[in-house]
Every structure is written in C-alpha cells, then in structure tokens.
C-alpha cells in the first residue's frame, strides 16, 4: 500500500484540527440535562465502589425497567479512579476523543462507497458538522453519544 500524498495527509490533519476546534468548550461546565444524571451515577459508583442499584443483570444493559445502560458510566468511573482525573476532565477528554474517532471512522466508512478522496473528506466534514452530532459531542457525557461514535 502506497502512502498518501502530502496534500491528502495535510487535509486529514486539518479535518482533525477543525473537529477539535469545534469541540473546544465555551462553557465553564459540561452541557446537557442528562449529563448531570450520568455524572451523579459515576460519582455514586466511585464513592460506593459498586453499582448498588443494578440488582438484575439486565440492568447493566438498560433492559430492566427504570434503568439506563451503564457501559459509559462504568468506563468513566473506572478511568477517573485509575488516573486520578476529575469527572469533568474525563468528560472533556471523552467527548473530544470520541468525536475524533467518529470523524475519522466516518471518513473510512465513506471509503466503502467511493474511492474519491475529496468525497470522503467532504462526507466526514459534513458528519462532523451535523447539528445532532455537534450537540452530543460538545462537552457532554451520554451513553447515546458513545454508541453513535463507536
């Protein structure tokens, strides 16, 4: 496999930098109403050391009445405990990292439809600028965003 030309490499770098620029936080705290619910769940897991409200195995997947999926919440509490980051710092890193993964993942996915570099780049740019994706990835912690990004 030959390496891409310098113009294509710089185009991908610019796409990544533009994605980072769009996700730069403009508020002093995370946004979204569900966000604070998931933050309190992660803090409860950290302080108690267990998921005390998940009594059924289906609760972990959000398939039991009154529960929500715990994958992203468990990941957040595990990473903040292991690294010593605050939950807010983790959410910022989480949203930026997943937005980069999903933007470049969409670039690779569009490569299945066309071999034209410009079309792939433009499709990834449009995905990165989509209003719903922007609201999910702007300093927000949501299991839906984790599912969409991956």
Regions found by a protein language model. Give the residues of each.
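Membrane-embedded, hydrophobic transmembrane alpha-helices
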Residues: 1-5
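Active-site lumenal/periplasmic loops and adjacent helix-entry segments of GT-C-fold
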Residues: 8-11, 17-149
